[in-house]
Amino acid sequence: MRCRRSFAVAVTAATLLWGTPATAGATSNNLVALWEMNESPGAQTMLDSSGHGLRGWIGDEVGAGVWVGGATGYRFSRLEPDTPPTHPRHLAIVPDATALDPGSRDYAVTIRLRTTERFGNIIQKGQATAAGGNFKLQIPSGIVQCLFRGSAGSLLVAAPRAINDGGWHTVRCVRTRAGLTLIVDGSTVARRSGLTGWIDNAWPLSIGGKTNCDQVSVGCDYFAGDLDYVAIQAA
């Protein structure tokens, strides 16, 4: 990320924050975590600039301190899908914390990414069979999808077009009590009504792929590309 102001611009560009125009415009009070990904090459700690101390661990296969297209971020190299061995050091991981679980709150995840690949889980907390539910953003066939699964059910929204063109894109997924909304580069591209309910698991938050996988019966879905920042908000 170039600076804190970059994140503020990305957030307020969206006409929808928690699902209604009346609440558009994020403030620092909404922030749960902000990982600006400005660390130097070789860094092992992912800093949280929200003030909440939700630091993460940067695997040594993650390229920190990469400058590309006017932004400093992390680079995740391409790994062949569903091909052993696993690469746990391909991930950036934040330990489980109550603040990171959506619970029943309105909850938004914002990421800025660039990729030319057609697969991978960008960010997730929990997996498909996790007790307590899970959420994730993934990019199969270059198309961003967002999923939230909770006590009341599961919802998935997907962008209508691929964004794996090598350019920077800002993706925002908003879970409210009414459903899911997906915003790409400031425009709402998908919306689905429905309930997801309570989401609270004991898993870490993982950036770059799954933490519990073997690349045989469970693929690790490693992301390949660059990330500029990740932010989480809740209200």
Go through the PLM ranges and name each one.
Residues R2-A26:
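Secretory targeting and sorting signals
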Residues T27-N30, D96-V109, T129, P160-G167, ...:
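Extracellular/lumenal carbohydrate-interaction signature centered on repeated Trp-anchored short motifs
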Residues A33-E36, D48, V109-T115, V171-C173, ...:
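Short hydrophobic/aromatic patches on beta-strands that form ligand-binding or substrate-lining surfaces
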